[in-house]
Amino acid sequence: MDDNLYRQRAAEHALRHVESGMTIGLGTGSTATFMLYGLAARLADGRLQRVTGVPTSEVTAALARELGIPLTTLDRQPHLDLALDGADEIDPQLRLIKGLGGAMLREKIVAASAARFVVMAAVSKCVERLGERSPLPVEVVAFGLPLCARRLKALGGAPALRRDRSGAPFVTDEGNLILDCNFGIIADPEALAASICAIPGVVAHGLFLGMASLAVIAGPDGIVELHAPSARQ
């Protein structure tokens, strides 16, 4: 079955965690797009009321406005009830790789601002160890690009500058560049995250560690909810 159908099913199921009156983080990417359409439908028919969103990208903000989803900012609402977003890889501890959509900095800020962070994904995004399938995106300031690339290579990565469809360097909403780094299997995500953060010029990386409360996974056998280790009984 098509991964898009699983993404849609995961997004629809995740919306069960949204309650009227909530302020929620709105993710970026293909799964988040399904969530936005589902949220808009629930607001339109009255199943949900007074839900306000904080978008994680300009793309998400534009679509939310088009769909009639009320928006706010973290300046006005610094504490969110819930954040909903997709992921590029999810391991059994709900550690994530995110950022292939180019919005990881805002995504991480929004997720950290939420009381609960619910991840939505097709079962194909589940891995035993991070790095099995996805490169690790690292957002860097343009001035620091040469240094960041050298330091990331020294850490064992193979950094490649992300480019847009025209072949020009991809520029994030914050005006930064992204190095997609192939580290292979990441044996110690926490140690790697700390090492990357110590590189001058790094703005953000795609390792989301200890942030997800719940993962909603859709596959051929239906929907599964995976709870973070700290939330398990």
Swiss-Prot record:
It is an enzyme of class 5 (isomerase). The keyword Secreted does not apply. It catalyses: aldehydo-D-ribose 5-phosphate = D-ribulose 5-phosphate. Pathway: Carbohydrate degradation; pentose phosphate pathway; D-ribose 5-phosphate from D-ribulose 5-phosphate (non-oxidative stage): step 1/1. Its EC number is 5.3.1.6. The active site is at 107 (proton acceptor). One of its GO terms (biological process) is pentose-phosphate shunt, non-oxidative branch. One of its GO terms (molecular function) is ribose-5-phosphate isomerase activity. Substrate binds at residues 28-31, 85-88, 98-101, 125. Keywords: Isomerase. Belongs to the ribose 5-phosphate isomerase family. HAMAP family: Rib_5P_isom_A. Catalyzes the reversible conversion of ribose-5-phosphate to ribulose 5-phosphate. Homodimer. This is Ribose-5-phosphate isomerase A.
